[in-house]
């Protein structure tokens, strides 16, 4: 196979790996019954007029399965962090003692678990669509190589087969992550 075909396949693989990484990050923000600092990663705090990710303003500790302690680096940001946590869609009620913010995660109701599973399935489908779009763009590039005469038909067919296998592998990976997240959510 030609170098151009290898480049198309390599680029597609890298983009699909990135799509998997984004899916992992998205799944980490979905709350389960356990305390996980990653669930706060998408929360932005109004820090002196600038929207700043909370993980840049504080450190997180999980002393218990359903409790997170948040220690702001700048105590002046305490009220802004607390406000951002209250306004988030996580359904939490933070308390503060002046030094740290304590977040006790309430037990998830069955209804809330099902809601989160729907969110997880939507995120998984978005990831699958992203991976399929990457495949489509790579296939278009392969077709262009064939049309321009840079690669023979047999090489293109082999490359398309590899691309399909790559796509299938990445979609299965997303399904695996989803299955794991659903099991985590259903755990009482």
What positions do the PLM features span?
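Generic hydrophobic/packing signal
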Residues: 64, 74, 89, 105-109, ...
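A positional/architectural concept
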Residues: 1-79
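Alpha-helix N-cap and coil->helix boundary residues
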Residues: 33-35, 96, 133, 137
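Positively charged, low-complexity, intrinsically disordered RNA-binding extensions
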Residues: 3, 101-188
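Short, conserved catalytic or interaction motifs in soluble domains
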Residues: 32, 90, 147
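Helix-adjacent hinge/juxtasegments
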Residues: 69-103
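Flexible hinge/switch segments at interdomain interfaces of large molecular machines
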Residues: 37, 47-64, 95-100, 107, ...
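Short, intrinsically disordered, mixed-charge
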Residues: 25, 83-91, 122-126, 136
């Amino acid at each position: 196979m030609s170098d151009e075909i290898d480049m198309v396949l390599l680029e597609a693989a890298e983009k699909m790996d990135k799509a998997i990484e984004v899916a992992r990050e998205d799944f980490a923000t979905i709350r389960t019954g356990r305390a996980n600092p990653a669930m706060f990663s998408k929360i932005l705090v109004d820090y002196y007029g600038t929207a700043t990710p909370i993980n840049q303003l504080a450190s997180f500790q999980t002393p218990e399965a359903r409790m997170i302690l948040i220690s702001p680096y700048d105590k002046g940001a305490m009220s802004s962090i607390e406000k951002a946590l209250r306004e988030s869609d996580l359904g939490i009620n933070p308390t503060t003692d002046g030094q740290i913010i304590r977040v006790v995660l309430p037990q998830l109701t069955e209804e809330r678990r099902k809601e989160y599973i729907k969110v997880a399935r939507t995120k998984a489908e978005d990831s699958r669509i992203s991976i399929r779009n990457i495949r489509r763009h790579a296939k278009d590039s392969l077709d262009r190589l064939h049309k321009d005469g840079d690669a023979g038909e047999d090489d293109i067919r082999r490359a398309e087969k590899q691309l399909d296998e790559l796509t299938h592998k990445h979609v299965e990976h997303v399904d695996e992550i989803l299955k794991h997240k659903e099991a985590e959510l259903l755990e009482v």
